[in-house]
């Protein structure tokens, strides 16, 4: 029930955020009328932020609500402040609500044990890449890492409503979900990283189908509340007058087109052909010439049908522009009838003088959906391709019309030879076919006087065949280009909303660091706390280290300790080994290292890291102490420390047989006894004994240590070696 209420609250907050984004782009005179409602919603956002304990919870739902409330509070104050400062000056209002430096650029600095790392966030994929890198380097990053810059960036982006600004995402950059999808799908022998080059990410942002109805104003105007009935009637009458004027213009254009078509030579030839064919019936023999005219009519009809189907499939850019102008005229008529003036919204104040045709395609309009703009753009590409001289020369419709005119000018139908053979000899091809009506006669039947004309016809025919071959190749290349670029064009031109991939990534990484901090705080409040970080005995360290080093690691234990090493090295983001259908820890680590682009030699080193002879690397009370600089060197040193811990515990269990001593992660604490690795340089190891289902309580003993072998000696004392 609580989750349902949070979902309902999140929906209301996102609705308010969307309204704020609309008001930031509206005429300030319109915003002034709605200012009291904005103030009430701003107060409600403050009340919710104080009432709901969102900071203490790390779920995607609570995180999304917290980010949305933070954005709503900031932008609500911004709108009200801009309205008070700018008055009715639209330019000043827009400058205060949307002006200034780009809010999608953020500098992030992270402190690790290997030094400070600085980067810049510009896109959503930059934030996701940073979180994946932080997940890989979590073992050299303290739990007190400052993620406030990332949190503010996400509040300005994910918290800023549903619609994603086009400048905020790069669809050519794959995310972790893209990589995982490609890993489980058929690859046809192609490497995953090569397939990623052609990937269009649809996870950080998702495409949304948008339906645009040009008649929305006419449908909704009679049902709008708060309008004076006289003004409503004038607005409806203005719409009717605009529709009548458009109908008259369309009828005049249709009449002019029909007149132009009637005067066309091709249409005249077609009417003559229709009259010639209508005069024939089945009781009269069909001559060769009549059959050729009928065949050309067939090809012309099929070609025109294909063109009409293509015209129904898409529109031209000019058609979209006319539709936008029509919608603008209708909106102007309604606004003048209702309000007596046209509000100076942001798109009207800036779009006319600052946006070109490409910007218009990206931004969109009120009369055409993104899919219609995409289809118009593709149609424009095909029209431009078909307008080349070579392809216009090969236009089959034009060639068939020319052949039809030549046949009709050849003479009367009665002087042709017999009919029955005409159909068999005419063939079933078009004009471009070798045996069709336009094919030249055989060479031996040509008179000597006609040799020059026959040679010219033969050369023209060869030139047409060569051009036809080139045109087929160019058309195939264009079709392939459209297929390859269509997905990216769809992603760019369609409306995109925020997906849940980035939010889940941020919550998983932040929850890992928060769980580590909560474990360390709980261990410090245990019923019995033994702090050996500064009081550890050197004799105990030396005894346990010498004992462990005298015994080699059993080769049969190598697979188990390798899996444990991979489990401890992996970050909190990729938890495939904890799913209901758990995979081995090396699978989760594979996704972690591949998503950060780890170099091949480091991946090979990590895979063979457990095969080592000298694995004892820490000094007395010197476990997880880093003296090196640089992320890679510090990461390698952390691997050595974790390898030492895993192998020392494995040998300890096989030598002393004092129960099942497990090495566990602090960010996955589930009330189990064992040795916990906290990844904190100040307190890297915590041994927990007597933990219950509720976690660490008054009856729990927690041993805080910074020495592996001293902690193993304390574990031996607390558990006691069995008598033999």
UniProtKB/Swiss-Prot annotation:
Q: Where are the transmembrane segments?
A: none
Positions bound to ATP: 652-659
Q: Which GO terms of the cellular component aspect does the record hold?
A: host cell nucleus
This chain belongs to which protein, by name? Tripartite terminase subunit 1
Gene Ontology MF annotations: ATP binding; zinc ion binding
- What is this protein for, i.e. what is its function? Component of the molecular motor that translocates viral genomic DNA in empty capsid during DNA packaging. Forms a tripartite terminase complex together with TRM2 and TRM3 in the host cytoplasm. Once the complex reaches the host nucleus, it interacts with the capsid portal vertex. This portal forms a ring in which genomic DNA is translocated into the capsid. TRM1 carries an endonuclease activity that plays an important role for the cleavage of concatemeric viral DNA into unit length genomes.
Which residues belong to zinc fingers classed as C3H1-type?
175-203
Region (Disordered) location:
410-445
Question: Which species does this protein come from?
Answer: Suid herpesvirus 1 (strain Indiana-Funkhauser / Becker)
Task: List the InterPro entries hit by this protein, alphabetically.
Answer: UL28/UL56
Segments of skewed composition (Gly residues): 419-430
Q: How does it assemble?
A: Associates with TRM2 and TRM3 to form the tripartite terminase complex. Interacts with portal protein.
